[in-house]
Amino acid sequence: MADMKKTCLHQCHVDLGAQMSPFGGFDMPIQYRGIVEEHNAVRNACGVFDVSHMGEVDVKGPDAEKFVNYIFTNDVTGAPVGQCFYGMMLHPTGGVVDDLLVYKRGENHFFLVINAANIDKDVDWILSHRNGFNVEIDPLSDSLGELAIQGP
């Protein structure tokens, strides 16, 4: 397990007694008190999940919207700030590079959330398509933590 990456919350999970397991190259919490109890908590109240293993990429600049539309299957044109989209990045032949979430953070500013197991591949693919677009692309995966709050 020496090669496993750890999220910024890893030690907190260990200290709280989480059952840890490899997932996407990270040592991640799988459960605390039991799957059934945790499932019921999410279905009836609220669950908090450490998703810090996911990859994050900032896209900013005058061509940010145009660039995101170029690499992403959904049209983000004119989306309000705060809007989130789920879709895919595709190869020119139609094969899937990866699925991802795209958030509009501001005018000419988008935030991409990519899958943990594909961070390096996806970032390289995104960077390889920036030519001709006036954008800044900033991989943030090593500097952010991320929590997902889920429930009814």
Residue ranges and their predicted role:
Residues 1-152:
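Basic, glycine/lysine-rich polyanion-binding surfaces/domains
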